[in-house]
Amino acid sequence: MKKYIGERIKRNEDPRLLTGEALFVDDVNIPGMLHAAFLRSDYAHANLLSIDITQAQERPGVVAVITAEGMGDEWQPGPPNVSPPPTVEDITFHSRTQVPLAKGKVRHVGEPIVMVIAESRYIAEDAVEDILVEFEALEPVADIESALDPQAPLVHDDLDSNLACHMIQNKGDYQAAKAAAEVIISRVIEIDRGAAAAMENRGIVAHWDPKSQHMTVWDTTQAPIPIRNGLASRLGLNQSQVRVIAPFIGGGFGPKMMMHYPEEILLPWISMKLGKPVKWIEDRRENFVGTTQERRQVHDAEMLLTKDGKILGVSHTFLHDSGAYDPYGLTLPLNTESHATGAYDVPNYYSDLTVVFTNKMYTTPIRGAGRPQGIFVVERLLDIAAKELGIDPIEIRLRNLIPPDAFPYDRGIIDQAFSRLIFDSGNYQPAVEKAAEMIGYEEFIRDEQPRLRAEGRHVGIALVPFVETTGVGPYEGARVTVEPSGKINVATGVGTQGQGHFTSFAQIVADQLGVDVRDVNLVSGDSAEFHWGTGTFASRGAVVAGNAIHASATIVREKVLKLASKLLETPEEELELEDGFVRVADIPRQSISLGDLAAEANPLRGAVEPGTEPGLEATAYFGPKSGATAFGVHAMIIEVDPETLMIEIKRYVVVEDCGTVLNPLILDGQVHGGVAMGIGNAYYEQL
């Protein structure tokens, strides 16, 4: 029986993507469809004194002009996506979530103030220019380090300060460790704000059908089922009346996991009011001011060590920029806390985090979701410690890695899921040594770097391990069905934004049912096709949805073998699944196709036997109790031009401890994409 897991199989979805046959949100066109455009704030912080929409309403082709006041009682802030952790006592938390349209005050550049609905996007954009808004400019809170000054202006007037959250976590006895430390390294470390800037901007098409009383929404979301649930609640509908479809999406990276953007509420709402379909496609300028961002933190960090480089403790007091609102609560800073000790055995840890409101676009997870900041802090401190102690940077890391016999390793703090942070398994040293070997670390230090520096060239090398908590819950589900055609249909709630799900999920099913991987059809991200799930984020597609698909396919396999055993009059253990057939192992010609079995499983006559059910179909769910812990190493040789400060990457090596690899080709693409985004974050982005 041919096995597909582990094979470098070209992606099933690529022909559609390459030939333009894949459906994206902007491809959705419905007769009579209207178009939306938004007047957004050019001010970071200002009172709204007046809004004159008269000229916009009078423009030919304009159907509606909506302000916050025009929404009446239906205007309300969005619900928080994450609540404060119930297990932490030493915490202050203030939740302020985004609003559909600004009312009385704008809190960041790009905040929507007025929505215009027109017969075309051109008319809608022109009408936006007709609107007159009188602002009273206020001093903005632009810097997280001054946000908590007593004289600082308030982002939210109903609060006493710009404090969104304060929380302390600790492990061991940090002060005792500090008293015993032989070396103390202290630094202030800053991380800049950046944007994901996915290739495809956000977009929504909402279609309320008054006759069927049914809402259909096409949305560039990473979480179609939670979006459905939220829309049903906000619009006063049953969940069965709302269908959310996340078609092909040109990159997600976290911002498209946001629930809910103002536009995601406003377009379905206005579609219901007008009884017509409405489309909005974000332009690139809007993307930079109206789509969530991440990364900005300032850490006052400290590392305690012995003279031989053994880490005794790590502490950091840090500020996290939440922007104007905090819909995701503590997700980002808790991820930072959880990763600020890296892959190392750190017996004493103290973390004091403060989240502040600023007059900037609010922050939500972007690829890494707070984890890269924590890793950067501990690795920066280790590099400084290695230099001051005269220890090789790789050697000081090897001395402090969590040893293999320490797993499962309890960090002694909670993570973003509000559960005990436990690293499930690992053996880190071989990956570090492999990366050093691949990049030629010893040869570079011994021969290449001295030679190049003698020529006046500025070259350096670094090797950094990382851990990442991934594959988090709560759960995902899947349904696997054998069709009478012999093809397999798989439905799951997770959407896809380029991860290769149409192929990797098909490989899982093909291995179980003995079919060609191209005979497995995936339907994903459609709440009408599969009703329960969470979304695609935190590297959880393969781990969580993949396990649900595997469980469903396993049940279907059992049904197939049971029915085939009856029809072929052969014990199940003597049957094989291959090439879409069930065969008797020693008599290949004695067989039956999966399609024929599917037809037999759905009889047109006779009663269904007790304890059985028609069809070759199964639905299963998978919910991990805790996330999986990924580990890897990045190594780079770089040259810097001292006159222009331009950089050139000479060599770059990545070693990943991946566990079971579903498809090496897809895996390579994921790693390459992560490296490219990381290089962009480090060298080319600052907002």
Could you describe each region identified by the protein language model?
Residues 1-161, 184-187, 273, 600:
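Flexible, low-hydrophobicity surface segments
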Residues 2, 73, 96, 107, ...:
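Gly/Pro-rich active-site capping loops and adjacent beta-alpha segments
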Residues 35-48, 112-118, 367, 378, ...:
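Short, well-ordered beta-strand elements within core beta-sheets of diverse protein domains
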Residues 61-64, 241, 308, 519:
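Glycine-centered tight turns that cap/initiate beta-strands
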Residues 84, 149-235, 403-487, 507:
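Helix-loop-helix junctions that connect adjacent transmembrane helices in secondary transporters/permeases
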Residues 241-249, 280-282, 522-523:
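Glycine- and acidic-rich phosphate- and metal-coordinating loops
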Residues 248, 252-275, 279-281, 501-509:
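Thiamine diphosphate
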Residues 392-400:
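Short, well-structured alpha-helical segments that form the helix of a local strand-helix-strand
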